[in-house]
């Protein structure tokens, strides 16, 4: 399909398709962009960092921390790719002119999105975990692996953690859980505090830009500041890991500002979609028609559900799974007396095992079907506005309002 071509629909209306950008891991981007690979000089898609070869014959390219980097612009990116075609040579990493110049509506390199699942998780996180694991004694490795296997998560986590000894079989989502939630809590008994603090810089940097803007417009700049400190001191704690995937993290703040949070910038969802379509084809084997077919089904289902959203949203929050544990009411009778004058405790007070708050289900300790999940652990704020943590014993309603009884956890 040519750029700016409109699609004529069956009802006679026209629909214009805009091609936003290209996302992929580094080897895939290298091919589609006609760019030098990570073993060459000037291999960054966003800047002109040169790189240094270390290790002699059979060594590696390393991209050490630089205070000032010259970024590629859309004009220089286009001109250098044309020069590469005319001279049949490597021009600052360009080996030719990519067909994406004529296809994408957002000019290169602004439309290039590196897949953080490959760069951050499958490459850099895996590499630092391997080096940390190599530092540990056999007994320490056993204890560390045992702690990871026993790590419990809320019920909406789809995957548990695997031990580092099974790292070859660990998937990207498991590495994400390990990096964001389990690595720092499990390592203090085994690592010096300086190295642990160094790792914390990377974990916090990724967490800040992984989801919503926790710090508003300052989120990306705060994340970059943490990462630059991590990048600058990286050679003190890890050997030969100043590779391209580490350097690409310098540009994550730009990706966050231009394209959104990291949790949305992944190729695995599309890979799963294409894989599913390839196995469950209907009438044709052409991927374009099949993808359109499934997207039409998805749009139809979403449009049908949207008409009920206005009424559903009003009733979705609140307690559920009522229980008949009247023996617990003595803990909350005093509270009931302050908010209600009915004097009928048995009729007014209701005990519940679960509660939906902002479309999220929270469990309590009396919900026995939670198995090994820990959706009863919550952070809450005291009357003074101080953050605290605790376990939800149970939920109850009084005077048509919902409350939770929480056992405070000392930090």
Where are these regions (language model features)?
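Domain-level detector for long, ordered catalytic/regulatory cores in large eukaryotic signaling
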Residues: 1-174, 186-187, 191
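Terminal interaction-prone segments of large eukaryotic proteins
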Residues: 131-411
């Amino acid at each position: 399909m040519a750029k700016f071509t409109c699609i004529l629909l069956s009802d006679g209306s026209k629909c214009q398709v805009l091609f936003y950008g290209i996302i992929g891991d580094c080897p895939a981007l290298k091919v589609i962009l006609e760019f030098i690979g990570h073993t060459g000089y000037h291999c960054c898609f966003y800047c002109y960092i040169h790189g240094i070869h270390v290790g002699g014959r059979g060594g590696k390219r390393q991209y050490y921390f630089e205070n000032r980097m010259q970024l590629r612009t859309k004009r220089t990116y286009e001109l250098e790719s044309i020069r590469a075609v005319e001279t049949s040579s490597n021009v600052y990493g360009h080996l030719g002119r990519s067909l994406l110049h004529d296809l994408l509506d957002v000019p290169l390199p602004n439309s290039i999105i590196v897949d953080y699942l490959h760069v951050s998780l499958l490459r850099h996180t895996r590499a630092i975990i391997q080096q940390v694991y190599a530092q540990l004694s056999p007994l320490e490795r056993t204890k560390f692996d045992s702690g990871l296997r026993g790590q419990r998560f809320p019920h909406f986590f789809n995957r548990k953690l695997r031990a580092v000894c099974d790292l070859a079989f660990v998937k990207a989502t498991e590495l994400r859980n390990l990096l964001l939630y389990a690595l720092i809590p499990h390592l203090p008994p085994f690592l010096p505090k300086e190295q642990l603090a160094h790792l914390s810089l990377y974990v916090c940097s990724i967490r800040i830009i992984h989801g919503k803007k926790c710090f508003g417009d300052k989120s990306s700049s705060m994340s970059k500041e943490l990462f630059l400190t991590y990048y600058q001191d990286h050679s003190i704690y890890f050997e030969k890991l100043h590779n391209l995937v580490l350097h690409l993290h310098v540009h994550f703040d730009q990706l966050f500002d231009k394209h959104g949070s990291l949790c949305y910038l992944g190729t695995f969802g599309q890979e799963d979609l294409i894989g599913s379509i390839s196995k469950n084809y209907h009438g044709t084997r052409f991927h374009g028609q099949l993808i359109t077919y499934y997207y039409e089904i998805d749009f139809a289902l979403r449009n049908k559900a949207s008409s009920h959203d206005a009424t559903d949203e009003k009733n979705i929050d609140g307690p559920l799974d009522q229980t008949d544990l009247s023996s617990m009411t003595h803990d909350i009778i005093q509270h009931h007396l302050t908010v209600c004058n009915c004097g009928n405790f048995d009729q007014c007070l209701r005990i519940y095992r679960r509660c939906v708050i902002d479309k999220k289900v929270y469990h309590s300790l009396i919900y026995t079907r939670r198995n090994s999940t820990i959706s009863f652990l919550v952070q809450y704020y005291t009357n003074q506005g101080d953050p605290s943590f605790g376990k939800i014993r149970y939920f109850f309603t009084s005077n048509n309002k919902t409350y939770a009884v929480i056992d405070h956890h000392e930090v």
